[in-house]
């Protein structure tokens, strides 16, 4: 029989059980002890999941790794809410953007510059910056009536969705008491209701 000795190394915005460096060291330590190490992440480890950093760290220390991709929450969570990220005649493309980074000013500039894109945009880890994200989109030329949705608890009993527009989504989310983690979706696909 297999036995496991799990270490919970969750990372939520503002709440980290360990720093990334400590996680890297723990992975290396357990691997060097001869353990079969499984680093299980929600979503895809290479979409803002630091999976690449962890694999490079292990490989640079002589540890062989095997990666098994997951399904990113950028696609899975909207799908669970009945929102396809692409849909014929509505959205031919989609982009995934982090909503949280050390250099938020340059991120807002990127968001402003991307406002001319006609496709769907999904923001991960951006709930605390929702007002600034929507403001950057509008100041970049995106119409205020562009549909927007915020989804939390995509796969558990805390699931909730709030829909609105760039003009009112931040207020609606605040009034609904939506908390992180959440996925933000902007674009006409928000009005497609598959549920």
Outline where the language-model segments fall.
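Single conserved hydrophobic/aromatic residue that forms the stacking wall/gate
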Residues: 1-6, 10
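Short histidine/acidic/glycine/proline-rich micro-motifs that form metal-
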Residues: 13, 43-46, 155-156
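Short phosphate-binding loop-to-helix
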Residues: 14-32
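Ligand-binding beta-strand-loop-alpha-helix segment within the catalytic cores
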Residues: 26-33, 38-39, 50-55
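Class I SAM-dependent methyltransferase SAM-binding "motif I" and its flanking Rossmann-like core
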Residues: 42-117, 160-164
């Amino acid at each position: 029989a297999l036995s496991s000795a799990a270490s919970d190394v969750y990372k939520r915005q503002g709440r980290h059980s360990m720093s990334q460096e400590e996680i890297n060291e723990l992975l290396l330590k357990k691997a060097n002890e001869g353990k079969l190490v499984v680093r299980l992440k929600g979503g895809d480890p290479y979409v803002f999941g630091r999976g690449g950093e962890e694999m490079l760290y292990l490989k640079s220390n002589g540890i062989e790794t095997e990666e098994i991709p997951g399904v990113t929450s950028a696609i899975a969570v909207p799908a669970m809410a009945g929102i396809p990220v692409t849909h014929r005649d509505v959205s031919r493309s989609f982009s995934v953007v982090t909503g949280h980074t050390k250099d938020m000013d340059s991120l807002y500039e990127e968001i402003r510059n991307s406002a001319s894109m006609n496709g769907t945009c999904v923001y991960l880890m951006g709930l605390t910056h929702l007002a600034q994200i929507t403001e950057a989109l509008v100041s970049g030329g995106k119409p205020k009536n562009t549909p927007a949705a915020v989804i939390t608890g995509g796969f558990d009993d805390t699931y909730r969705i709030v829909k609105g527009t760039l003009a009112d989504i931040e207020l609606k989310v605040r009034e609904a008491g939506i908390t992180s983690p959440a996925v933000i979706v902007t674009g006409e696909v928000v009005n497609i209701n598959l549920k």
